[in-house]
Structure formats: structure tokens, C-alpha cells
């Protein structure tokens, strides 16, 4: 089932971003909105207040919460992501979410990088040994 796939791919991973780096980002990105960076497919979302989002389609992406916590609901399952757990979404998937705690002194900040499935497919087709390595567990 797709939810099980998401669960398997939502790896726990300690992501370390220095407080200094986050403070610099907060000085240059717009507050309380989604910022599309000059790097194609890289987005930053800032909020200093709680908010919910419903009935969205999450595109293939990797999302790293730099500050705060994000709660995502997929069907009956609920997943929490923070600066020690990132979200990997390999396919388009309907979901809803909530940012419960965010304030000016402790804003929510997430960095999201879209995955270009077509480019990944081309890389895998051009390098079949990559697929073989994964299948063999290398």
C-alpha cells in the first residue's frame, strides 16, 4: 500500500543545521510565505504562527524541517517531522498537515527540494549498474 511505502521511505535521519545558518536564512527569506529560491525546485516555507493545510498533493520531494515541527496526515496515519527527521515523498500523494507551534521567536522553517522524476529516470536508464547495486544491497 502507498501509505506503507511512505512509512518505509520516511527515514529518521539526524539533520544538523547550525543555529547561525538558520538565523541567516531567517534574515533573507520572506516571512509567513513560501519562498521559491533561485535554485530550481528549492523552496523555503516560513511561518511565525500555527497553520493547517488540507487536500494538497505533495509532489515528489525531500522536505527538511530546519526549525519547529510539521505534522503530516496520510489517511489514518500521522507522521511528525522535525530537524532530526526528514520527509521523503517519492510520488504524488494527497495529504494534509499542521504546524501547531510557531511564533516570531521560534518560527517554523522548512526547506523542500522537488525531485524531478524524469531526470531520475534518465539517470537510472543511462546507468543500469545503479539499479543493480541497489537490488544487491550495495
Residue ranges with predicted function:
Residues 1-38, 51-52:
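A short, N-terminal "cap"/entry segment at the start of jelly-roll beta-barrel domains
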Residues 35-134:
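N-terminal regulatory/effector-sensing and dimerization cores
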Amino acid at each position: 500500500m502507498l501509505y506503507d511505502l511512505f512509512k518505509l521511505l520516511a527515514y529518521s535521519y539526524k539533520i544538523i543545521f547550525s543555529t547561525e545558518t538558520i538565523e541567516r536564512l531567517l534574515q533573507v527569506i520572506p516571512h509567513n510565505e513560501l519562498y521559491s529560491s533561485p535554485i530550481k525546485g528549492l523552496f523555503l516555507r516560513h511561518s511565525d504562527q500555527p497553520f493547517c493545510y488540507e487536500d494538497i498533493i505533495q509532489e515528489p520531494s525531500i522536505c527538511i524541517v530546519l526549525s519547529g515541527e510539521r505534522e503530516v496526515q496520510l489517511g489514518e496515519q500521522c507522521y511528525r517531522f522535525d530537524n532530526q527527521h526528514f520527509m521523503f515523498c517519492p510520488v504524488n500523494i494527497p495529504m494534509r498537515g499542521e504546524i501547531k507551534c510557531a511564533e516570531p521567536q521560534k518560527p517554523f522553517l522548512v526547506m523542500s527540494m522537488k525531485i524531478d522524476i524524469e531526470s531520475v529516470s534518465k539517470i537510472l536508464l543511462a546507468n543500469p549498474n545503479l539499479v543493480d547495486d541497489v537490488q544487491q544491497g550495495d
